[in-house]
């Protein structure tokens, strides 16, 4: 979840490191730091806070070899002491790390017996000192240390007097490439210059990066030849383009994203390989985390209703340890915006080990998940920077819908649903009175039935993530089984009712809330009876399977506007990071 950058060049790359870190800040923003070679010495500067806290230093530094880091704390509280880069006890090497070392306490105790004095609370300092104690050249030292580590890591190591960076990878993404007058390592290809050549390190691989060369090694330190691709990422995707926050920009990009998906998948060949995976399949297990899990719930339901398939959605961190989840003739579908979600990747690896076919629905076709899966479907959402996912959720759901329709009817044409993109433009604005209501509430509830119950979960998650309000989503029928005890005068309850067949029952639940003093914010199709609603958000008329793609947009906007009204940064909520690359 941390962001790693390293550059070795003939030029001063201090500012390049800073700019690259800014692009990685979505991965964590508890603290930031940089370490560079200054003659034969290593100079380190780090601060608690966002990346901008090291800007002045980077503007004035003169490093041609440097590593840098933006941190999301796992071991040790966010503070300057625990910020990366972390230096070894004698100062021989300095390290930046993304991941979790599970056996760090055992190694730490052994090192303390050898006289090492630790200055931080991090697991990273253990790795740094372990490397220092090993014998051999720089690569061999890193390799020997990594062999003793249990857990996940991407490491970039700088040694005193060596104009090179040693890289190691296990279960945490890391890329190498050529740019900035030399060579570079980074956690995300966003950091590279456009048209730069890059490749991903695979699990167990190492690399030594100098200004003139990138040499990749296998787990046994045999030299590996790899093909490099050209960066084609548009810089515009990571610019605000007139918006104050990325989350606002990304919500407003949803109509264009939906339009692109409809256009891209009009070409059935782009989805044909995924369709073939369903041949002979009796069970579908959809595996994901967070917002992607909610999209997986939508996907399971659309496959059940459209095809009559046995389909279930699972939280990835639980699926790995469930008993009796291995069945014959099963397809696993992994869902992830980044394609690097650690728990989903580990669950996917388990599925492969047990003979499952694996389909990935992702937003990054260069990700670890794409390489793991038999087939990957692109959600075409473009880069999503805001920590709280918005346009990617809508995109995942639409890809599931299109896949289900193609599986049911090979003659399906995506332009049958092209009005969806235009309809989504109609629900981007919300009543400021609703925002004021949520801002002043201590807790918020969301209820719905069937597809709407899934939207309720996602709406609650958005409010929770960025406004820090207590927010929960429930199936409407569950109100009487506990939740009504929490409803009193003035409690806001979002009632989602976009399915005509469920509307009367859902409104009956709304009446129960109203009778206890709750305030009803109804989201429904324009033609539906509004009953006891205090506030109404109308969505355009649409089939029940597509209505959730419309109803979720005002929920995202309300969450965004509420966070902004409170004074929170919607793009960077406390304690969270965009890409969850640790378990």
Residue positions per predicted region:
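Short helix-capping/linker segments at secondary-structure and domain boundaries
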Residues: 12-13, 133-140, 163-164, 405-414, ...
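Glycine-rich oxoanion-binding loops at beta->alpha junctions
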Residues: 64, 68-81, 261-274, 300-335, ...
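Acidic/histidine-rich
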Residues: 152-182, 441-465, 500-502, 507
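Active-site phosphate/pyrophosphate-binding segments
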Residues: 253-285, 375-492, 502-503, 566-583
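Glycine-rich phosphate-binding loops that contact phosphosugars or nucleotide phosphates
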Residues: 276-422, 449, 496-540, 558, ...
